[in-house]
Design a protein with these regions (language model features):
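Residue-level recognition of the N-termini of beta-strands and the immediately preceding loop/turn
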Residues: 13, 70-72, 185, 215-216
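Short, intrinsically disordered, charge-balanced linker/junction segments flanking boundaries
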Residues: 305-310
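N-terminal, positively charged nucleic-acid-binding surface of large information/translation enzymes
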Residues: 1-66
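Alpha-helical recognition segments enriched in aromatics with Gly/Pro capping
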Residues: 1-6, 59-60, 81-303
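The substrate-binding groove and active-site-proximal loops of carbohydrate-active enzymes
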Residues: 38-47, 72-77, 163, 191-192
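Short, glycine/charge-rich beta-strand/loop segments that flank catalytic centers
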Residues: 16-23, 51-58, 68-83, 101-109
Length: 310
């Protein structure tokens, strides 16, 4: 919708999307599991095979939903050199320290840390949990480059000035966006769950490297949620996600007789900053409404054609 709107309004846009095929953890902080490595080990496949499978599945769904593909699709594993060069700039500006074999970003060196989430560093320190990584000076410091992996048999590693290892997952977004969009660009999108950690860290490292503003506008979308299970002890609806077990695939909807565009129409019924509650009743309503809209448009086009002939 954003892509089509900007194009309709006459803006010269360039849409860049990254594919995280290295170092993606199950959470935004450094203490999560490595999703790619875990899945590869479970399926007895390589990390790149797992990444390729899900990338193809993702774009297959994108096409079925009639979503315009990005102008640039870039893989993290193909931009390691750019990440290393960006980390060098951050290091040259005295924002880093080595500890336990890993290179960390020191958030105390960036005064505006937490501004996206309207949090200051002192408030963050006061509410911090027990630090899992004892090498960190501050619980909110984050890894720019790992040489001492906590994961056994880390599949992909590269040479770097800090030793053989791999990048933290925040740095890829900054490095690739700067390569294709420059040191400052207009719009960065993402889920609201990325505000307090991932996007906050992106800003710190990007502006720590360049010394100026990185992104002009942030657009954060809310979650698609599902009604709680009858056996749940929570009164709240849950985010639809694979990790929680309460998720549906686009193919599931198609198998139940819905068109992929019925699902797209369902999502368009809510503001992007509002949670969307999924239900089969809502899907039926979206299916019927889209059918009625298509019929009305067809009648208008037929009427216009007849008028032109007359």
């Amino acid at each position: 919708v954003l892509d089509r709107t900007l194009t309709f309004l006459g803006y010269n846009k360039k849409h860049v999307m990254n594919i995280t095929d290295i170092g993606h953890l199950s959470g935004d902080s450094d203490d999560g599991e490595d999703k790619m490595l875990k899945t590869a080990q479970e399926r007895h496949q390589s990390v790149l095979e797992i990444a390729d499978f899900y990338t193809k599945a993702f774009f297959n769904d994108i096409d079925r939903l009639n979503i315009i593909r990005p102008d640039v699709v870039c893989k993290a594993t193909e931009h390691i050199d750019e990440m290393i060069e960006l980390i060098k700039k951050i290091e040259a500006n005295d924002h880093t320290y080595m500890a336990g074999g890993n290179l960390y970003f020191d958030v105390t060196t960036y005064p505006d840390y937490g501004k996206l989430a309207n949090l200051n560093l002192e408030d963050l320190k006061a509410g911090a949990r027990v630090v899992v990584d004892e090498n960190k000076r501050n619980p909110h410091d984050f890894v720019l480059w790992f040489t001492k992996s906590k994961f056994e048999n880390q599949a992909l590693v590269w040479d770097s000035p800090w030793g053989k290892g791999y990048p933290g997952w925040h740095i890829e977004c900054s490095a690739m966006s700067m390569k294709y969009l420059g040191e400052q660009f207009d719009i960065h999108t993402g889920g609201i769950d990325h505000i307090p950690v991932h996007h906050t860290n992106e800003i710190a490292q990007s502006e720590g490297a360049t010394g100026h503003k990185w992104v002009n506008y942030w657009l954060h979308n809310e979650f698609l949620v599902v009604q709680k299970d009858k056996n749940s002890t929570s009164d709240e609806a849950g985010k639809m996600s694979k990790s929680s077990g309460n998720f549906l695939t686009l193919q599931t909807l198609i198998d139940k007789g819905y068109d992929a565009l019925d699902y797209r129409f369902f999502l368009l019924g809510a503001h992007y900053r509002s949670q969307v509650m999924f239900s089969w009743t809502a899907m039926d309503s979206a299916k019927n409404s889209r059918k009625a809209l298509n019929q009305r448009v067809a009648k208008i086009l037929l009427s216009a054609k007849d008028t032109a002939i007359t």
